[in-house]
Amino acid sequence: KLGKPTVAFASPPSIAGHANVVGKKEGEGPLRASFDLINQDDTFGESSWEKAESAMQKLALQNALDKAKQAASTLDFIFAGDLLNQCIASSFAIRGQGVPFFGLYGACSTMAESLTLASMMLDGGFGEWAAAMASSHFCSAERQYRTPLEYGGQRTPTAQWTVTGAGAVVLAREGDGPYITHATVSYTHLRAHET
């Protein structure tokens, strides 16, 4: 350990495969060439935005597994999260895989958190393979946190826009790298109310 928040891994896990899937708007931006799959239909052929988000996670995981030349059955653990109640996008994405699942709830932090926890699990010798995943969908986030699109409210040009995308990383306990050598966990600084 380096100080209180940073962990140095004794056996740094190797990134064996990674993939990302995004929606149309993200594909129109300056990072277009960095994406593995850009879908022109934000429903991803599904009947709801929540199902679309789950479909993105499935696609990202399968692409990452393909790059790692592994099957889902080789995974010892999946660490995944999204912004929906009870992590339903993640839960339904990995349903039927037969892999132990840690559901994480958070926004952008979920990707770093899932990578950190998966790395700790592998470095600790509790498995050989793990996946770290995160997703969000603009439309499902609007419904849950802001103004549901069905409401028809007007958005200002400077309003937040949650990404429609999913990312997955397959980690191996041993491999040719790149490696996750360290992880730093943030502090929450709260001041106790003095009475």
Give the predicted meaning of each segment.
Residues 104-132, 171:
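Active-site-proximal alpha-helical scaffold in enzymes
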Residues 71-75, 124-133, 178:
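Short secondary-structure capping/junction motifs at helix and strand boundaries
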Residues 31-34, 90-100, 122-123, 145-154:
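A glycine- and small-aliphatic-rich helix-loop capping segment at beta-alpha/alpha-beta transitions
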Residues 15, 49-109:
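Conserved beta-ketoacyl condensing-enzyme motif
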Residues 80-81, 130-136:
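Short beta-strand segments
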Residues 1-48, 148-191:
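Condensing-enzyme catalytic core mediating Claisen C-C bond formation in acyl metabolism
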Residues 1-2, 62-67, 115-119, 154:
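Short alpha-helical segments and helix-capping/turn motifs at coil-helix boundaries
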Residues 86-88, 138-143, 187-191:
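Short, well-ordered, mixed-charge alpha-helical segments that flank or form enzyme active sites
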